[in-house]
Structures are given as C-alpha cells and as structure tokens.
UniProtKB/Swiss-Prot annotation:
Gene3D superfamilies recorded: Cytochrome c oxidase, subunit VIb
Main function: Component of the cytochrome c oxidase, the last enzyme in the mitochondrial electron transport chain which drives oxidative phosphorylation. The respiratory chain contains 3 multisubunit complexes succinate dehydrogenase (complex II, CII), ubiquinol-cytochrome c oxidoreductase (cytochrome b-c1 complex, complex III, CIII) and cytochrome c oxidase (complex IV, CIV), that cooperate to transfer electrons derived from NADH and succinate to molecular oxygen, creating an electrochemical gradient over the inner membrane that drives transmembrane transport and the ATP synthase.
Name under which the protein is recorded: Probable cytochrome c oxidase subunit 6B
Stretches assigned to the CHCH domain: 21-64
Compartment list: Mitochondrion inner membrane
Pathway the protein takes part in: Energy metabolism; oxidative phosphorylation
Organism: Dictyostelium discoideum
Amino acid sequence: MEGEQLQTAPYNPRFPQQNQTKHCWANYVDYYGCVKHYNGDNSKCQTFFNSMNSLCPAAWISEWDEQKAADLFPSDRV
C-alpha cells in the first residue's frame, strides 16, 4: 500500500451514529443507482464509489455484486 492515499467517507448527517452499516449500504445502492442513471458512465458517481469502498468491507461488496449478478439483490435501484 505504499504510495496509496487512504481516505474515509465524509460526514453525512443522515448517519450520525458510529454504526456505519446503513451508510455503507446506502452508498452501495447510490453508486450503482447513479451508474444505472447515467447509462454506465461511472465518472459522475465517483463520490459514491469512494465512500462505498471506504465504509464497506470487501466481503460485503463481493456478496452484493454476486447477488446483483444473480438478480437477487434486494433493491430495484441498482
């Protein structure tokens, strides 16, 4: 990780508690919803992507990606 700059997601008043599970979920759904809205152009969705990768464990993202691929993900926004 040498030379890689780590950043955490900025404060979001919708999620004031320390438990950031819902914040992680919201950024995952918001990122893929944004990409869907812009027809695959993820350059406009970078804020959601950075927050998602900062807050969510890689195992969760991987699991949700598998659910999306199998059309089992529990949100119609992605």
